[in-house]
Amino acid sequence: MSWQTYVDDHLMCDIEGHEGHRLTAAAIVGHDGSVWAQSATFPQFKPEEMNGIMTDSNEPGHLAPTGLHLGGTKYMVIQGEAGAVIRGKKGSGGITIKKTGQALVCGIYEEPVTPGQCNMVVERLGDYLLEQGL
């Protein structure tokens, strides 16, 4: 299965039980900042934005004072799981990033999708990739 298929079929799919509700954008990005696959709507990001996310995954709390920036959008960092999940909020939307052994699984949402639904979609794929040694 291609990385693009993971994005299209597992991240940008309808949310279980909520037909028509899906993430706004999603991507799988290597720890080095290279994009493995992304939705057409995923923002163009700067290398320093991805570096900040990687630093926070290794040093939890790094982004809390400045916020998480992706594609020029600033998200307020909210509770996550140290070294595993970073969550951010902006207005009625937000972002979830799950770190695996080799990649970052990223999902961006807006209402009517809820933070919990975004977390479920992103973390489910991230957990699967971890189980596969990725």
From Swiss-Prot:
Task: Tell me the Gene3D superfamilies matching this sequence.
Answer: Dynein light chain 2a, cytoplasmic (3.30.450.30)
Determine if NADP is one of this entry's keywords.
no
The alphabetical list of record keywords is: Actin-binding, Allergen, Cytoplasm, Cytoskeleton, Disulfide bond, Phosphoprotein
Q: What SUPFAM superfamilies does the entry give?
A: Profilin (actin-binding protein)
PANTHER family the UniProt entry points to: PROFILIN (PTHR11604), PROFILIN-5 (PTHR11604:SF25)
Protein name per UniProt: Profilin-3
Q: Where in the cell is it found?
A: Cytoplasm, Cytoskeleton
**Family that this chain belongs to:** Belongs to the profilin family.
GO cellular component term, pick one: cell cortex
N-terminal signal peptide: none
Q: Where is this motif: Involved in PIP2 interaction?
A: 84-100
